[in-house]
A protein has these predicted regions:
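Basic/polar, cationic surfaces and motifs that engage anionic cell-wall
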Residues: 3-11, 82-223
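Active-site-adjacent loop/helix surface patches within enzyme catalytic domains
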Residues: 1-123
């Protein structure tokens, strides 16, 4: 399952945050406004309306507002599931997360990390439920993803996050290097070139002025 190239614009991104929609197994209209990529119950992928570009750097109008106060530099990927779910006692509701969805999520996140050269750590690849603990940004009791209905032995945000990261790293290891631009490296190179283009005339004038001053001082001493 390959992500279409136009889903991954060439911009710097810092992290991937994974969610569930608390909805049906299909992507709703509201879901498409909130996330960059959605994974439906059968593993099918749906592109959200906001481009990842809008969340690069300072957020821009129309960005994907998927995580409170943590949208800048963050790619939002969400599983379409868990409508009516209850945290305690745990009840996955009528639309539980499926193993097929989870497996598709792993591939999607691995592809994003590979393309954007995001190193997999608890602060760069995490679930919404981990944001408050891992990044120190309050999230008002969000618990997605802290349970895997298809595997009841995995309980808690940290356990689910560790499973996510472990599987993403394994998937990345089996992926070939993508023949695409590195968003972070290319963006930095472009910014550096623009800065150099702007500064070079100033530097040249400064060097010229300094050289002329040096010549005048030498001539004074000779005379």
């Amino acid at each position: 399952m390959a992500l279409p190239p136009d889903w991954m614009p060439n911009v710097p991104m810092k992290r991937v945050i994974c969610h569930w929609t608390a909805g049906l197994h299909s992507a709703g209209e509201t879901d498409k406004d909130a996330y960059h990529i959605l994974v439906e119950g059968n593993g099918g992928l749906v592109r959200g309306r906001p481009s990842i570009t809008l969340n690069s750097g300072r957020v821009k109008s129309g960005y994907a507002a998927h995580t409170l106060n943590c949208n800048s530099g963050s790619i939002g990927v969400s599983l379409c599931c868990m409508a009516g779910a209850e945290e305690r006692p745990f009840n996955a509701g009528q639309y539980p997360m499926t193993r097929t969805q989870w497996d598709a999520l792993i591939v999607v996140v691995a592809a994003l990390c590979k393309y954007y050269r995001i190193k997999v750590t608890p602060k760069t690849v995490l679930s919404h439920a981990e944001v408050e603990r891992n990044l120190g940004i309050e999230q008002r009791g969000k618990w997605d993803v802290s349970r895997l209905p298809f595997d009841p032995t995995v309980v808690g945000a940290r356990a689910c996050g560790d499973r996510l990261r472990q599987q993403v790293m394994a998937a990345m290891g089996s992926m070939p290097d993508l023949p695409v631009r590195s968003g972070r490296d290319a963006a930095l190179e472009t910014a550096f070139r623009r800065l150099l283009d702007e500064l070079w005339p100033i530097l040249a004038r400064g060097l010229e002025a300094g050289f002329n001053t040096l010549v005048r001082e030498i001539l004074k001493r000779i005379r």
